[in-house]
């Protein structure tokens, strides 16, 4: 979010090293692979005398005898799960960056992190609650084991807050966690007074005839199956339906799994209302000399967009989960300093929705809108963060009358409600009854 969490953590490390001396012990930072280089650079910038060891990749070695109270070791969640050397070392401070990675206490990542011996623990995240309050409990229980009781007891006591943020339990929960949380928001006085605003634009685009035919056919065929199924089978069919509709809304090329080699640029745009709208928008930005981030939830959609925009002559890059960490930083640096006046950076939401600073962009385009408001906000914050000097324009491409149009209405009308209900994304929608589900996915035709 750009509120100085990394800098605050570095300051904490320096404070411990200075006040406790050798008894402080070394600091271990565990983060997503995409953030290793960012941590190295921030430490070099603000604490240049601090020894830093990057413990990741093949050939890594950990000389515990060389670690002292001034040392910071940076590793990834993936390395932590696989490497016993990290759990065999006594750490003074363990930092879990983007701590939402441990929101599931039963996951291998959360279990591995619990096994790391440390005198102190610090969780760093911009989204302590993405889906439900159990995630908040998981993070707090890692930092302070046992203080907040069992997960089931915590949920029983405060679960009502998820459905009603104004429930009586909300005030009690706030008082309970306040001593253990340092929370900053961009709207807090003095935090980011120089940060410009952001403006949201909802671009409602029509489906093409091909998209309409595919959409209506998949709704008709799948709803027939859903109405005669139950339990796990029904939930699976609902998720499959929602994924298919989102892909059709993006472009038939994605849904039909067509090879890009055979995709003619003008043909791609003619087949997809969204792609045609993106063409128009990026052309306008190119004329103005303004850079943009384009977020998508599908890696293959990112490849389609990259192929399409490159053929259109745009300066374009694509970062996704399969991009090696070193290459990720190269892409970020290249975008931030691209001599082209209007570069486009395509990013998968899952791989790039947190941690990166991309203030070169003054436009954020959500090609397929995340149904989790917290995830969407985190992606937008890649550009709207400290260091940004221009108003950020946030564009949501929404296909008219479709399931994402219905979801957009909910997000617009009931933001507080969606934080608790829709925050779990498609999973919550599997619990709708057949009538509610039909109303959600049915294609509403325009009156004109």
Across the structure, where does each feature detected by a protein language model lie?
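Rossmann-like adenosine-cofactor binding region
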Residues: 167
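ASCE P-loop NTPase motor core, strongest for the SF2 helicase catalytic module
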Residues: 1-163, 175-195, 199-448
């Amino acid at each position: 979010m750009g509120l100085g969490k990394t800098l605050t953590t570095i300051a904490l490390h320096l404070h411990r090293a200075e006040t406790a001396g050798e008894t402080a012990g070394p600091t271990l930072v565990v983060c997503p692979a995409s953030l290793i280089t960012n941590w190295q650079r921030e430490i070099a910038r603000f604490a240049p005398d601090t020894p830093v060891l990057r413990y990741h990749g093949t050939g890594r070695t950990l000389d515990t005898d060389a670690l002292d109270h001034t040392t910071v070791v940076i590793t990834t969640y993936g390395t932590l799960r696989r490497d016993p050397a990290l759990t065999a070392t006594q750490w003074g401070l363990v930092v879990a960056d983007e701590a939402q990675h441990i929101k599931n206490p039963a996951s291998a990542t959360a279990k591995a992190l619990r096994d790391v011996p440390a005198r102190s623990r610090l969780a760093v995240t911009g989204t302590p609650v993405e889906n439900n309050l159990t995630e908040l409990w998981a993070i707090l229980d890692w930092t302070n084991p046992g203080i907040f009781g069992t997960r089931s007891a915590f949920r029983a006591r405060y679960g009502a807050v998820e459905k009603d943020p104004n429930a009586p339990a909300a005030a009690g929960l706030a008082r309970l966690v306040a001593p253990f949380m340092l929370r900053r928001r961009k709207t807090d006085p003095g935090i980011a007074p120089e940060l410009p605003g952001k403006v949201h634009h909802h671009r409602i685009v029509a489906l093409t005839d091909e998209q309409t035919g595919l959409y209506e056919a998949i709704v008709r065929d799948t709803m027939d199956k859903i109405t005669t199924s139950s339990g796990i089978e029904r939930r699976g069919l609902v998720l499959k339906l929602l994924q298919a509709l989102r892909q059709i809304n993006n472009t038939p090329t994605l849904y039909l799994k067509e090879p890009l080699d055979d995709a003619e640029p003008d043909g791609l745009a003619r087949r997809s209302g969204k792609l045609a709208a993106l063409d128009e928008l990026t052309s306008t930005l190119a004329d103005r000399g303004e850079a943009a981030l384009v977020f998508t939830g599908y890696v293959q959609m990112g490849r389609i967009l990259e192929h399409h925009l490159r053929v259109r002559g745009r300066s374009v890059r694509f970062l996704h989960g399969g991009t090696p960490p070193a290459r990720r930083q190269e892409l970020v640096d290249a975008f931030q300093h691209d001599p082209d006046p209007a570069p486009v950076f395509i990013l998968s939401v899952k791989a790039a929705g947190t941690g990166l600073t991309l203030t070169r962009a003054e436009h954020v385009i959500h090609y397929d809108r995340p149904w989790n408001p917290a995830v969407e906000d985190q992606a937008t914050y890649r550009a709207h963060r400290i260091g940004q000097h221009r108003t950020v324009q946030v564009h949501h491409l929404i296909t008219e009358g479709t399931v994402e149009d219905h979801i957009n209405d909910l997000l617009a009308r009931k933001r507080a409600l969606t934080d608790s209900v829709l925050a779990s994304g498609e999973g919550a929608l599997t619990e709708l009854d057949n009538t509610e589900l039909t109303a959600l996915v049915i294609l509403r035709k325009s009156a004109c």
